[in-house]
């Protein structure tokens, strides 16, 4: 099979070609020498297809960078030249294997220390760190908290991709800890997030999602919720647009009668209304669905304003807002339900047919719940 050089450079699975046999064209099939219009002869080698065995070692090394870490051993065994070209990837592969076999905090610390002294590029840490994260629960429970911190701190030193490991630790590893340990690890992650530069991707939305892993209604929950609300003003527009809807949803952790909710709602609403229309859909929609936190006398006016803002949004943001608007109807006087649905009908026509059908179905489900 001929090797496509262009595909090797641009297609993720190109390395698979090297794992297959690469037969050379038969001699009898060699094309005749062509004579161009200029009268010169074309170099026969220029017309031959490039095969894996013709590739320079530098290109093989580049292909190897796209090989999934679990396949590095097989790819390195293709031939001697590949084995040497894959040296740096084989080092990562060995650390990845060891990460999959850790059984104690001591083995985690030893591995991380060796990686710090051996791996030249921060990106080489990604695959072993992700393996450590996935095997965190293989450690004795009393050592898992410190291991969590070591892995989290190591990920902090990896530009761009390290934050993805941190997000996974928060969303998938933190729930495995007991209640009394989650507060400590949450605070550790929060402190690390504060150290990131403003232009860097961060974990504020994930931290807000993790509030559900804390004891609802507790002083610890309230304190951390308020800290995230207070950070909104310092975040980029895109970060605020992601964080506000999550904070709206996490108001459920307070309980419906908590007298702090109206004030927190007002802060979220103020920030949402200051977002550009290109980022408002989810925040406006979620705030409309969360009017239950307000006194009864204020709900209709607040909902009406948010609905009007939603209907003025660009089509893409309108589609997002419509997913939540009808969920606020349960908190409105019944005589406003039909009128509210009537107002949304023209907005539905602005959506693409598939999205329109989905939005109508969602609204009908919300209406049916009102009269069950």
What are these regions (language model features)?
Residues 20-21, 27-29, 37, 44-46, ...:
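Intrinsically disordered, low-complexity segments enriched in Ser/Pro/Gly/Ala and basic residues
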Residues 1-50, 88, 370:
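Non-Sec secretion/translocation targeting segments of pathogen effectors
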Residues 89, 94-372:
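Non-catalytic tandem-repeat scaffold regions and their flanking low-complexity/translocation tails
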Residues 39, 46-123, 127:
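Skp1-binding F-box subdomain of Cullin-RING ligase substrate receptors
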């Amino acid at each position: 099979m001929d090797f496509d050089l262009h595909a090797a450079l641009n297609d993720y699975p190109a390395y698979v070609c090297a794992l297959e046999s690469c037969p050379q064209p038969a001699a009898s099939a060699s094309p005749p020498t062509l004579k161009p219009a200029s009268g010169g002869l074309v170099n026969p080698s220029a017309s031959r297809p490039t095969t894996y065995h013709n590739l320079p070692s530098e290109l093989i090394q580049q292909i190897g960078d796209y090989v999934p870490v679990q396949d590095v051993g097989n790819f390195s065994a293709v031939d001697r030249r590949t084995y040497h070209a894959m040296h740096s990837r084989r080092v990562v592969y060995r650390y990845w294997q060891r990460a999959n076999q850790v059984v104690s905090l001591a083995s985690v610390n030893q591995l991380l220390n060796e990686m710090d002294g051996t791996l030249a590029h921060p990106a080489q840490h990604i695959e072993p760190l992700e393996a450590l994260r996935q095997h965190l629960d293989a450690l004795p429970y009393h050592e898992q908290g410190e291991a969590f911190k070591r892995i989290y701190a190591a990920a902090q030193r990896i530009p761009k991709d390290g934050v993805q490991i941190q997000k996974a630790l928060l969303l998938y590893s933190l729930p495995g800890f007991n209640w009394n340990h989650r507060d400590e690890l949450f605070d550790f992650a929060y402190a690390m997030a504060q150290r990131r530069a403003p232009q860097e991707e961060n974990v504020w939305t994930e931290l807000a999602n993790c509030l559900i892993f804390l004891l609802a209604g507790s002083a610890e929950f309230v304190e951390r919720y308020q800290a995230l609300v207070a950070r909104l003003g310092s975040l980029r527009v895109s970060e605020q647009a992601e964080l506000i809807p999550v904070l709206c949803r996490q108001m459920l952790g307070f309980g419906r009668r908590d007298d702090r909710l109206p004030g927190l709602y007002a802060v979220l609403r103020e920030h949402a209304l200051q977002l550009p229309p290109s980022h408002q859909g989810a925040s406006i929609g979620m705030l409309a669905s969360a009017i239950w936190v307000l006194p009864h006398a204020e709900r209709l006016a607040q909902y009406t304003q948010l609905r009007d803002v939603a209907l003025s949004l660009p089509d893409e943001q309108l589609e997002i807002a419509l997913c939540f608007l009808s969920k606020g109807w349960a908190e409105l006087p019944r005589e406003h339900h039909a009128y509210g649905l009537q107002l949304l009908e023209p907005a539905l026509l602005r959506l693409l047919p598939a999205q329109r059908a989905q939005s109508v179905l969602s609204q009908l489900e919300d209406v049916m719940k009102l009269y069950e």
